[in-house]
Regions:
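A short, active-site helix/loop in glycosyltransferases that binds the activated sugar's phosphate group
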Residues: 52, 192-219, 421
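N-terminal subdomain of nucleotide-sugar transferases
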Residues: 1-75, 196, 268-275
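Nucleotide-activated donor-binding/catalytic signature segment of Leloir-type glycosyltransferases, i.e.
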Residues: 282, 287-319
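Acidic anion/phosphate-binding donor-loop and adjacent secondary structure
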Residues: 54, 73-78, 175, 221, ...
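A charged, aromatic-enriched C-terminal amphipathic alpha-helix characteristic of glycosyltransferases
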Residues: 378, 382, 392-425
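Conserved donor-binding/catalytic core segment of Leloir-type glycosyltransferases
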Residues: 11, 239-258, 265
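Nucleotide-sugar donor phosphate/pyrophosphate-binding loop at the beta->alpha transition
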Residues: 157-162, 170-189, 229
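Membrane-proximal helix-turn-helix segments that form the acceptor-binding/catalytic region
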Residues: 30, 112, 119-126, 145-148, ...
Length: 426
């Protein structure tokens, strides 16, 4: 049995910690799930935990400190408690609308919001480090506040820190001003002062090694996005697709996925010689999806389910769709990303269809390990052909399913990766 005394006391700093429903949040949960509850504390945002997540997703065992609502720290665990403390959604929506519509208000509001977050995290962090006898910190990437605050807490308290990048930082796309400016200023400082830098794939490692040289490369450790195989293994059944066929996408939908997902919808709408549909399970509001051009139709269904249901849903699909888009706001983020849901897909015992540019690490990783059909051209006819190959070429499909499971156990098994993560703090 793992004992808290075996570990340095850790302060987890994240804007979007579990139980928030996101790939990054789920990966944090997977890495920390088996750590003794007294070995770490979590400094995070109360207001980034939505009501659905609070009710249906899973909280970590460690102590929560909410930097934006200290009075709620380590007390709230139910939907009713979260809702009771929640500000008016109508007021928040009106403020967000004004900020988006008026650039000056957006710049002013964004500066105030980011500045306030950083100050709150630092203030709460100083108190927590002293009270909880923290020995080391780890900042998880967001749009800036968590990792910038980690850097400043190191300067103030002299406690060492690691940085965990789910995506590249400086060259990402941030809609909130002044996130991009701050990223350009602080990324070199954050990397220089970090004891270790954790990334989720070789593409990101190579990107930072090229950008900053050998000294930074030596600090970098790869811990792939992961999930627990036991959630899936008991759900397996033979892959034998029958009409009506179902393509499945699970996860949030933002600018990195939108164009590629629309290509799939177009391909499905044009397939008239068989009964096929797309099911999208995502937490995004339907009004947001409508605004970006993704709506329900006879062949497209938009649904929502808690993370605990995803293994059952994914293992019943005929094809699992994994998109990254062309002509986006940040090609560098597209080229270095590995979506968190990849780990789920690999162990699902179902074929994966990747629709992403050939320049992406995701496409190259899949081809190298032959675990998916990679449609790396933005061509609707070839995408339709890929769908039919996965449904009807059973020899090919069986091979990529087996290769996917092999890749999972090599790189994406949360039981293994959690141990790699734990070793960093002994």
């Amino acid at each position: 049995m793992t004992n808290a005394s075996n570990f340095k006391k850790i302060l987890i700093i994240s804007s979007y910690a579990p139980p928030s429903m996101s790939g990054a949040s789920q990966n944090i949960y997977n890495l920390l799930r088996n750590l003794p509850k007294d070995s770490y504390s979590i400094l995070t945002s109360f207001y980034n935990i939505d009501n659905i997540s609070a009710k249906t997703s899973t909280w970590l065992k460690g102590k929560y400190i909410f930097y934006d609502k200290i009075s709620a720290s380590d007390l709230l665990r139910t939907q009713s408690e979260i809702i009771k403390e929640r500000p008016s959604r109508l007021i928040l929506n009106k403020l967000k609308y004004l900020v988006k519509r008026i650039w000056f208000l957006g710049a002013l509001g964004g500066t105030f919001i980011m500045g306030s977050q950083i100050i709150m995290i630092i203030r709460a962090g100083i108190k927590t480090i002293k009270k909880e006898k923290i020995k080391i910190m780890i900042g998880f990437s967001d749009y800036g506040p968590a990792i910038i605050s980690t850097y400043f807490l190191n300067k103030i308290t002299k406690k060492p820190y690691y940085i965990f990048f789910f995506d590249i930082y400086k060259d990402n796309f941030y809609p909130v001003f002044p996130a991009s400016i701050l990223a350009k200023i602080f990324e070199p400082k954050i990397l220089k002062n970090a004891e270790k830098i954790i990334v989720t794939n070789e593409g990101t490692l190579n990107f930072y090694a090229k950008e900053y040289g050998e000294k930074i490369r030596k600090k970098i450790i790869i811990i792939h996005n992961s999930t627990f195989s036991e959630h899936y293994l008991n759900l397996y059944n033979d892959y034998d697709p029958k009409s009506p066929y179902t393509i499945l996408y699970t996860g949030s939908i933002y600018w990195p996925q939108i164009r590629s997902l629309k290509n799939l919808i177009k391909a499905i709408e044009e397939i008239n010689d068989m009964d096929i549909n797309l099911k999208i399970y995502c937490p995004n509001p339907k009004d947001y999806l409508k605004k970006i051009g993704i709506t329900e139709s006879k062949k497209v269904k938009i649904l929502i389910a808690p993370p605990q249901k995803m293994p059952e849903i994914q293992t019943q699909a005929d094809i699992l769709f994994l998109p990254l888009s062309w002509h986006t706001k940040s090609q560098k983020i597209i080229d270095t990303a590995t979506p968190g849901k990849l780990a789920d897909y690999l162990i699902s015992n179902r074929p994966i269809l990747i629709h992403a540019p050939s320049s992406t690490f995701l496409a190259q990783y899949a081809k190298k390990n032959n675990f998916a059909y990679v449609a790396d051209e933005e061509n609707i006819e070839k995408l339709k052909s890929a769908i039919k190959t996965l449904l009807f070429d059973k020899t090919f499909t069986k091979q990529i399913i087996e290769n996917a499971k092999s890749t999972f156990f090599k790189n994406h098994d949360a039981n293994r990766n959690a141990l790699l993560f734990q070793e960093l703090f002994k």
